[in-house]
Amino acid sequence: MDKLFVYIDGTARGEPGEAAVGIAITTPDGSVVEEISRLIGRTTTEVAEYRALTEACRHVIPYEPSSVVFFTHNQRLANYINGVFETREPHIKHQIEIALGLLNQLPRWRLNHVDQKVNMRAPRLVEQAFHQSLQAQATRERMELVLLARVATLSDDAMQRLLDYADRLREEE
């Protein structure tokens, strides 16, 4: 593959809080190669931004592009990765080292700071990860309520069989 454009974003809901990354990998003409939208656990927005960059690198490297242009609306991330500024925060230094280690596996790369309007796709993917998580949680809660309602109507013998069956299911996982 010749050249790829990669749009990245990472956000936490709370500082720290549940965090997600959004990554859009495209060709220069805008054709989508891959989109990543996923929760990454509990962290800060700053760390989530670096995690978006490192995860983007891990997805891009197998395509073996001749060059990659990354886009972020996080000026601080762009400045640190591009060596404009240095951080004194050890946990951020560690994130930078990881990112640079992956970036340097690419033949040519560049990280550009862009206006948030240019980088709209990645934040939408972040929101998609949060939304899917909420939907999954709501679905699970509904299933639990239905299960509780049905269990409440069972006889003691049927409830014991259900408990035995649940134990077998847990052992299989």
PLM regions and their residue ranges:
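A detector of short terminal or domain-flanking linear segments
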Residues: 1, 28-31, 108-110, 131-134
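RNase H catalytic domain
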Residues: 11-15, 54-130
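Intrinsically disordered, low-complexity regulatory segments
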Residues: 120-148
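Short coil/turn segments at secondary-structure junctions
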Residues: 36-40, 83-86, 146
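Short, low-complexity, charged amphipathic interaction modules
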Residues: 140-173
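Loop-to-helix element that buttresses phosphate recognition and phosphoryl-transfer chemistry
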Residues: 48-52
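RNase H-like nuclease fold core
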Residues: 1-47, 58-62
